[in-house]
Amino acid sequence: MGELRPGSGVHYPGSVGELRSWFGTDEDCLDYLDWLRWPEGFVCPRCGHLGGWAVADGGYKCAGCGARTSVTAGTLFDRRRTPLTVWFEACWSFASGKDGMSALSLQRSLEIGSYATAWAMLHRLRSVLVRPGRDRLTGTVEVEETYIGGEEPGLRGGRAKGKKVLVGVAVEVTEPRGFGRARMQILTDASAGTLHPFITAHVEPGARVITDGWTGYQGLDKLGYTHEPRSQRAARARGEDPGGLLPGVHRIASLAKRWLLGTHQGSVQEAHLQSYLDEFVFRFNRRRSRSRGMVFYRLLELAVAHEPVRYRQLVANPQPKRVPPRPPPGGGHPPSLDRPRAARPWRTS
């Protein structure tokens, strides 16, 4: 959005009441997505030409190549069946909940007839939470690995056994005990061939990187980092708790596991774990935001910047494995949430 500084009540709704007043019809929602996607005017997704003509179905015809496109084509909302008014309610619920929400909670709150629909909506939202080209971590950064799904003392990296998933954790640390942004990513093992790419993908060269003494971290200085390894063995020899060497990543890992257990009862399949980690990081990095409306705004910005994810990409089976036995009454897809129409303040700012 360039130099735009979004404001509550102008560029995004400041309350759920304002949300429902602004987005009473799918046409209102489409206009908002149009404004978010092309704030300086229509840009053809096919040829990149600036400018076109609005067509009767609410889309555009490119003035350059003549291609027709809809506002939602190539976005999270492409080929949707659920009304956009319901999607916007789901986005608000997703953004406004401090700890997120389960598919069952979304199904009940919006009276979505199909649990599978609510489940897929949440997973599609999770699929857009990583901004393309996002900035890497800077300053002082702690890096460590952890296991999601259980731990076995004494096992590490490729030597680990059991149904656990190895996850890389990186977090900016500030004095005296503060945290900045975080990153989490599933790792295949804890070798240098895996850890080095994880760090270069998420940490800006020149940063001070603090790790334990694991051999997989050796050589970071050659990649442009100031590497500070901290030996667990030396800490034990000094009578110190080795867990205190990297308090930042241990805190983040603990919060993530607690969040998975509390919000999703720990029932996260490995195939979807990265999406849940992306959601946790999205929420953690916005923990100081005072406006849920701003988080809603950022979420929709991401939604129009990402390619759509199809249902068949989300599941290996025709439906999620855990389907509640008593869905709310109604059809497979909710009706549009009809509301009084309001002005479109984002167009008048």
Where are these regions (language model features)?
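Residue-level recognition of single "structural anchor" positions
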Residues: 1-349
